[in-house]
């Protein structure tokens, strides 16, 4: 069935000058992937310091690292429940708020239990954003550019991991393993 005369389709709007706006919105939404990658990778450089500060053995360090993964599972389940209810954009905003709370809580954690909870919160944000961001980008993108725009999310995850490792190296006290 053809579109009524004079009514613009999603793809027509892409051609009529909104290309830059949609691309910018997609890149901003994909920044959730940057946070995903950064919060996943940054622990590697901090783990020895955390272990020393909280007197952790291997199991304690494993709990700190894996708490973000457990949170991501919880976050993806939460995302299934809220995305259709509040929308993809609001879900991304909510995950951004959880990223902020989790990051601040991680920075000021007085003990390993608080750090585990903070990292669990970061994982929840990762889980929500990993579901919401690609869906949101898919919905705003015209069919001809959908794959390209959605791939920004994965690119941002990779860039986030790279930034985390560069950050880890910059703040390490020595250049050895």
Regions found by a protein language model. Give the residues of each.
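Transmembrane-helix signature of 12-pass secondary carriers
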Residues: 2-177
